[in-house]
Amino acid sequence: MIEASKLKAGMTFETADGKLIRVLEASHHKPGKGNTIMRMKLRDVRTGSTFDTSYRPEEKFEQAIIETVPAQYLYQMDDTAYFMNTETYDQYEIPVVNVEEELKFILENSDVKIQFYGTEVIGVTVPTTVELVVTDTQPSIKGATVTGSGKPATLETGLVVNVPDFIEVGQKLIINTAEGTYVSRA
């Protein structure tokens, strides 16, 4: 059992009614009067629906035991993403709604880890950083300094991140997948 106050983004737990829930965001909130509450943005792993809720910090949940296996992202067709276990060569189909955040960071043939709850495929874990190429951004301005606020850049997966002014189209960048932010040039 795990208390609500210990839940963090990325953790998965099971509710009393058998729903498998993944934490997308979690924060402590202390109202002016009353007790602290945990505000959370959650995703039902099986249906892909997201919802906001709050719990008392002492509420307990059954932590789900998740196993991971190395895999490769193959392709996406319609509403399904296809992955292959790199050890057994088994292929898995995962609804895009369950992995849409992760797909922003991976290209075809990228290495990932598939998450299992028992025999059920429930999601994908991407590396902590990835290298992606800039496909669209405003032109660089001569004399631009690093101290500027930056500019938006669209990457080859469609992800838009804020980058320094000196970044140009065609450059390869290192992106932090946990925060979806620019780290450095590759």
From Swiss-Prot:
Involved in peptide bond synthesis. Stimulates efficient translation and peptide-bond synthesis on native or reconstituted 70S ribosomes in vitro. Probably functions indirectly by altering the affinity of the ribosome for aminoacyl-tRNA, thus increasing their reactivity as acceptors for peptidyl transferase. Keywords: Cytoplasm, Elongation factor, Protein biosynthesis. Pathway: Protein biosynthesis; polypeptide chain elongation. GO terms for biological process: peptide biosynthetic process. The lineage of its organism: Bacteria, Bacillati, Bacillota, Bacilli, Lactobacillales. GO terms for cellular component: cytoplasm. It is found in: Cytoplasm. This is Elongation factor P. Belongs to the elongation factor P family. InterPro entries: Elong-fact-P_C, NA-bd_OB-fold, Rib_uL2_dom2, Transl_elong_fac_P/YeiP, Transl_elong_KOW-like, Transl_elong_P/YeiP_cen, Transl_elong_P/YeiP_CS, Transl_elongation_fac_P. It holds the Pfam family EFP_N. The keyword Transmembrane does not apply. GO terms for molecular function: translation elongation factor activity. The keyword Hydrolase does not apply. Its main location: cytoplasm.
